[in-house]
């Protein structure tokens, strides 16, 4: 029966082997075993008789094996040696509170689900406000880099900047420093705002000049003539321009005024040396 007792004692020691592990080197004896520290589990109670396990063995044992009582494991010299060292190991102080335990690397104890958050000055901007409500923010590998947020100017700041731009299209550095202090902005913000405002102003000026050139290139539109002036009768009734000599030509005949000219005659005025021929009246 002594062999069976040693068998059950060895089985129990195998189950609780993590609690009885000791470091191989003597310099590690000052700290608790690695399994106790990493597992962070309370130490198991000292071994004692197991009536429950013994009853299970009695139920499952064949009829030819008679039940027996297992003596306390403390009577075994091997188990007594372990009991002698167990209280000393459990009474050891905890490891010193430091950034990392002895022999451990910094990357080993880092939490696996730790997420690298953006910088504090990026959290307060509106561009990153949606990240707090986004469900996939915890799975982001790294924050977005090389992205500047757009500066939101207030109405008071825009009013002062527009007033300054009305007087000076190009701002000097002393005035820029003064505006930066007065409007609670940086010099870079004011410089970039003036650059953008000048570009907008130049585009507006080019558009105005382009509209005026299009009107001037086509020429000034002539006033519309009256429909009566464009008729043939009024054109014939108008007196011809005076010749360069200054002599006044005779008046055009009435028939020419009324447009009743024969086919062979024209309504053009004759020179002053030749007398006009009168048309024959029909009989």
Curated annotation (Swiss-Prot):
InterPro entries attached to this UniProt entry:
HD, HD_metazoa, Homeobox_antennapedia, Homeobox_CS, Homeodomain-like_sf
Upper lineage ranks? Eukaryota, Metazoa, Chordata, Craniata, Vertebrata
Q: Which gene encodes it?
A: PDX1
Enumerate composition-biased segments (Gly residues): 211-220
In chain numbering, motif Nuclear localization signal lies across 197-203
What family, per the record? Belongs to the Antp homeobox family. IPF1/XlHbox-8 subfamily.
Positions bearing Phosphothreonine: 151
In its UniProt entry, what is this protein called? Pancreas/duodenum homeobox protein 1
**Any keyword Cytoplasm?**
yes
Q: What is its main location?
A: nucleus
Any keyword DNA-binding? yes
Keywords noted in UniProt: Activator, Cytoplasm, DNA-binding, Homeobox, Nucleus, Phosphoprotein, Transcription, Transcription regulation
The domain-related comment in the record is: The Antp-type hexapeptide mediates heterodimerization with PBX on a regulatory element of the somatostatin promoter.
Where does this one sit in the cell?
Nucleus; Cytoplasm, Cytosol
């Amino acid at each position: 029966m002594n062999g069976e007792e040693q068998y059950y004692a060895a089985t129990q020691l195998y189950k609780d082997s993590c609690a009885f592990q000791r470091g191989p080197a003597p310099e590690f004896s000052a700290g608790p075993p690695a399994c106790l520290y990493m597992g962070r589990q309370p130490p198991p109670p000292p071994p004692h008789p197991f009536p429950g396990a013994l009853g299970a063995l009695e139920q499952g044992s064949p009829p030819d094996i008679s039940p027996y009582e297992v003596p306390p494991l403390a009577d075994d010299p091997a188990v007594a040696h372990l009991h002698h060292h167990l209280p000393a190991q459990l009474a050891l102080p905890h490891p010193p509170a430091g950034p990392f335990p002895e022999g451990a690397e910094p990357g080993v104890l880092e939490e696996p689900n730790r997420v690298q958050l953006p910088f504090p000055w990026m959290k307060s901007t509106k561009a990153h406000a949606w990240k707090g409500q986004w469900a996939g923010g915890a799975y982001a590998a790294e924050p977005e880099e090389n992205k500047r947020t757009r500066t939101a100017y207030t109405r008071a700041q825009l009013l002062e900047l527009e007033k300054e731009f009305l007087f000076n299209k190009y701002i000097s550095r002393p005035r820029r420093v003064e505006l930066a202090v007065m409007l609670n902005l940086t010099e870079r913000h004011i410089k970039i705002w003036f650059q953008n405002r000048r570009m907008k102003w130049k585009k507006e000026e080019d558009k105005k000049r382009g509209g005026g050139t299009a009107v001037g290139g086509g020429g000034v539109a002539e006033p519309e003539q009256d429909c009566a002036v464009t008729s043939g009768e009024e054109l014939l009734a108008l007196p011809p321009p005076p010749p360069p000599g200054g002599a006044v030509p005779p008046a055009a005949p009435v028939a020419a005024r009324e447009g009743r000219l024969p086919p062979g005659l024209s309504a053009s005025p004759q020179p002053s040396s030749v007398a006009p021929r009168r048309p024959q009246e029909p009989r």
